């Protein structure tokens, strides 16, 4: 019996003690064996570090306590917004010998504890402006041995406590895009190792820190399309009346002289009024003794003078211009000599004569007949050195210069511009102490002549086949020349003071311009281009800082 009882096994109490002891052994073993942290196959990890080689993307499955990450020879080329935001405790980040070509805006967002960032030996040409946004704790930054050619302006602005910066081993192009860096290096408290220019040739191997700011010519200008007036026009004349800015446009296509008003709030030209004019070629506004008059010159149906009545707020016809004197007007010039107001009309009729009219008390009266029988096309009034002159041109003979005689109170023929016998139009400008004439030609090159007393010397020839309009104008100290054509786009030239000639500056898509008009409107500097075949375009002159 005793043997049978022995085969029944250990007592229940002994089994319970054995089970308890086994559990305690398991707990002790669990405490002795460290838990393996998560780690991607391309990385080697400890509890707070990760070293990754040949990764195909920024590793995601990393210990949350990681404070140091190294990426070497990564198989991806771009780092995008928030790429490391899953590692908020990161303090050290090394991106070395990778194939990175792009690091985008906010690439390191969420790394508010990052102190050391090394992006070295990659193939990055440039960085985004906000690449380093959010790195408020960064003290050491290395961008050494990349292929950086430029850096966005103020890229280091978010790095408030940056102590050390390394930019060595890059291919910096020291043009206007780097000017801001030269300025920043001169004032920053950050320690920056010497860096050198790779280009352009004149700065090659020069230390960036030593570049003189005066060597950077970074301010340029541009004419940008500002407003489109959806109608053709053949002349444009801005004028001020009662402290407001207006524009008079001759529009034979709609049988009117259209008056536009500048809206200083909307900063646009708005419709204001119209004067009936079935065949208008020029609408010339004149403000005489605070009264507004508009001379309406027409090819057919006679020419007239209108007066603005502020009481009825409308234009009323003041007088007719004798059709026997003015048959086919082509251009108008208004000017003041010794306190008296005049306007001259260029007559393109074979039987007509260019005529001068003078204001007297209540109207304009015929004052002088000039240059009869020559089919004149253009007038230019020049008031220089106290000697008022009027230049009359047409396409069949040399332009004629008339000088005002204060004794006779008339224009007297002074000479001709024989260098250009077929000028379609003549304009003038002054540069320094010298006076110049610009003469446009429909066939052949337009000419720039220096005016030297009674002599003229050619300065420049400008290709201009099909040109019926040119205009020199001055904007903020910069001198330009607009040269139009019926066969090609308008060319804008800029005056080169050193070379004393115009250089090609910009091309404007204007079809068949008939005039160019510079109009300052508050802080907007505008160039108007009335077109005979298309829309009338308004361009704005803007100043561009290439270092921005």
From Swiss-Prot:
Secretion signal span: 1-30
Domain LRRNT: 31-64
One term under GO cellular component: synaptic vesicle
Keywords for this protein: Cytoplasmic vesicle, Exocytosis, Glycoprotein, Leucine-rich repeat, Repeat, Secreted, Signal, Synapse, Synaptosome
Statement: the UniProt record of this protein carries the keyword Glycoprotein: yes
GO BP annotation list: exocytosis; regulation of exocytosis
Glycosylation sites: 189, 311, 394
Organism annotation: Macaca fascicularis (Crab-eating macaque)
Matches recorded under InterPro entries: Cys-rich_flank_reg_C, EAR, EPTP, Leu-rich_rpt, Leu-rich_rpt_typical-subtyp, LGI_related, LRR_dom_sf, Quinoprot_gluc/sorb_DH_b-prop
Gene designation per UniProt: LGI3
Protein name, entry field: Leucine-rich repeat LGI family member 3
Membrane-spanning parts: none
Function: May participate in the regulation of neuronal exocytosis.
Superkingdom assignment: Eukaryota
PROSITE patterns: EAR, LRR
């Amino acid at each position: 019996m005793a043997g049978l009882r022995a085969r029944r096994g250990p007592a229940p109490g002994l089994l319970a003690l054995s089970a308890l002891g086994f559990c305690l052994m398991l707990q002790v073993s669990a405490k002795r064996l460290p838990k393996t942290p998560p780690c991607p196959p391309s990385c080697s990890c400890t509890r707070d570090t990760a070293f990754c080689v040949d990764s195909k993307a920024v590793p995601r499955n990393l210990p949350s306590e990681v404070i140091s990450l190294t990426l070497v020879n990564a198989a991806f080329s771009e780092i995008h917004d928030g790429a490391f935001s899953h590692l908020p405790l990161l303090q050290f980040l090394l991106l070395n010998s990778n194939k990175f070509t792009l690091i985008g805006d906010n690439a390191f967002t969420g790394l508010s504890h990052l102190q050391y960032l090394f992006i070295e030996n990659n193939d990055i040409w440039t960085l985004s402006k906000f690449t380093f946004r959010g790195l408020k704790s960064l003290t050491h930054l290395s961008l050494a041995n990349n292929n950086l050619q430029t850096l966005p302006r103020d890229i280091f602005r978010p790095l408030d406590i940056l102590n050390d910066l390394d930019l060595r081993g890059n291919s910096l192009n020291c043009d206007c895009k780097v000017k801001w860096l030269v300025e920043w290096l001169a004032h920053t408290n950050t320690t920056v190792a010497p860096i050198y220019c790779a280009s352009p040739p004149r700065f090659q191997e020069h230390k960036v820190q030593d570049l003189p700011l005066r060597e950077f010519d970074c301010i340029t200008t541009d004419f940008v399309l500002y407003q489109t007036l959806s109608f053709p026009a053949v002349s444009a004349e801005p004028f001020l009346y009662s402290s407001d800015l207006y524009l008079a446009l001759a529009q034979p296509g709609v049988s009117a002289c259209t008056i536009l008003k500048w809206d200083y709030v909307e900063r646009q030209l708005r419709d204001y009024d119209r004067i009936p004019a079935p065949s208008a070629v020029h609408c010339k506004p004149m403000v005489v003794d605070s009264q507004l008059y508009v001379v309406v010159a027409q090819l057919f149906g006679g020419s007239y003078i209108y007066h603005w009545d502020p009481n009825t707020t409308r234009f009323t016809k003041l007088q007719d211009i004798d059709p026997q004197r003015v048959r086919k007007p082509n251009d108008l010039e208004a000017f003041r000599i010794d306190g008296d107001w005049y306007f001259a009309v260029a007559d393109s009729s074979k039987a007509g004569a260019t005529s001068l009219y003078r204001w007297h008390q209540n109207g304009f009266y015929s004052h002088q007949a000039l240059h009869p029988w020559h089919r004149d096309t253009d007038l230019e009034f020049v008031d220089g050195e106290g000697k008022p002159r009027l230049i009359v041109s047409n396409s069949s003979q040399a332009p004629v210069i008339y000088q005002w005689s204060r004794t006779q109170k008339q224009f007297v023929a002074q000479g001709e511009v024989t260098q250009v016998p077929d000028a379609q139009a003549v304009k003038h400008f002054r540069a320094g102490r010298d006076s110049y004439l610009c003469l446009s030609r429909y066939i052949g090159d337009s000419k720039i002549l220096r005016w030297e007393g009674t002599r003229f010397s050619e300065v420049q020839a400008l290709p201009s086949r099909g040109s019926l309009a040119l205009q020199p104008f001055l904007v903020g100290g910069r001198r330009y020349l607009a040269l139009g054509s019926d066969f090609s786009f308008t060319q804008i030239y800029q005056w080169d003071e050193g070379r004393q000639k115009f250089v090609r500056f910009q091309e404007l898509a204007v079809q068949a311009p008939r005039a160019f008009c510079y109009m300052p409107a508050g802080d907007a500097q505008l160039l108007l281009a009335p077109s005979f075949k298309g829309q009338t375009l308004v361009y704005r002159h803007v100043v561009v800082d290439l270092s921005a």
